Amino acid sequence: LLHKAIENHVWRQEQCVNLIPSENTPSRAVRLLSGSDPACRYAEHKKILAFYEKEVFYYQGTKFIDQVERMLAEEMRAYFGCTEVETRTLSGQMSNMAVFSALMDWKNRFDRKNEAKRLGYVMNNHIIKGGHLSAQPMGALHDYIAVDPVTEKPAVVNFPVCRDNPYKMDVEETKKLIDRYRPELIIFGKSMVLHKEPVAQIRQFVDEQKIPTTIMYDMAHVLGLIGDHFQNPFQEGAEIVTGSTHKTFFGPQRGVIGVNYKEEDLKYGLWKTIESRTFPGSVSNHHLGTQLGMLMAAYEMNQFRDAYQSAIIRNAKSFARSLKSYGLDVVGDPAIDYTETHQVIVSVGYGEGAEIAERLEQNNVIVNYQATPDEEGFTASGALRMGVSEMTRFGFEEKDFDQLASLMADCILRGREIKAD
């Protein structure tokens, strides 16, 4: 087992070009810390009213972990630019579930005698249009969404997309649907993401129309891009941000929740509910080893944020242009060099994605095949979804992505073996 694990490690870390956009490589420091002593410890804790809202730990030997959690919260608040963060969730999906559970509990806070009412209309990105599973009725939203009495299906309304660009939200049509359905929750965020989400425009609209909704942004794929090179969600009007910490962010595989509520705000009670739906609602042992590694990752991100993020956007746009120049069908808007994120998407023909992804893997290029918005599902996947974040961390620059694009075009279009190159 050790031999095979080391063999696999060397292959992925030293011999492959890793282009899966939901993956990254943590630093050696993050890996080391993630496997240190806290990895086998417990540190359950919560704020107790009888102890004047102080954090009370249920185990001894946790003073170091207490310090780590406080420092991590401080670093993540600085990174997000928000008032409160929860770092105990173990994944983006768990983060979303904690938020959905809290929203449902908050909705029913004045009626504890009757069966809890589920969330009314929720707006999100359709899964075939790039939406993430964790924001779908078939995923994390399943137990918290009401049934539409007209359709007898989950009360979800999907964002409409532009006719000439199915990867981009149609803002004006979205406003019409918001006005019609008056959703309780609006969830931005996608797993197949080429564009910024129109957070500021939708925030302005719901405020003007006095629609009492909560705006949430699931930033799992773009968490490491928060800032001036991409989006500042809280400045634009998001109330809640969730995400996983290992895609564009530098961390081990964990989750995080941030909110921008102040103690004097009515919705600060929702934040307190999010905390309680995290622990004890969602997790007992919150994996102290990777939480320690996450602190180092947060230090790294806050130190190198500007250089990393600018390189990501620059490399993604350059990679997309190069792929197009070598004859591949790059999707998206050419006016913005096809992407505003770390992702680049190439159409390879109906149902051809899996075979071409396997061909590339045989040549040590690792990609992710996906269905396009025009295809009926994953089995018909005709696209390759790629990200530049991991190879940017390994030091790739625009010239390297241009060389890679040329080799990939040879492999995809002409069937040439490129492994030796």
Where is each model-derived feature located?
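N-terminal glycine-rich, Lys/His-bearing helix-loop that initiates the first secondary-structure elements
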Residues: 1-71, 204
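Conserved small-domain helix->loop->beta segment predominantly found in fold-type I
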Residues: 293, 298, 309-361, 366-382
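Conserved PLP-enzyme active-site core in the AAT-like
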Residues: 64-67, 71-329, 388
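PLP-dependent enzyme catalytic core of the Aspartate aminotransferase-like
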Residues: 74, 110, 314, 378-421
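Short, well-ordered beta-strand elements within core beta-sheets of diverse protein domains
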Residues: 19-23, 300, 342-349, 392-394
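Short hydrophobic/aromatic beta-strand micro-patches
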Residues: 258, 345-349, 387
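Short acidic (Asp/Glu) and glycine-rich catalytic loops that position anionic groups and cofactors
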Residues: 9-15, 42-46, 51, 183, ...
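A short glycine-threonine-serine/GTX helix/turn-capping micro-motif
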Residues: 19-21, 277-285, 393-395
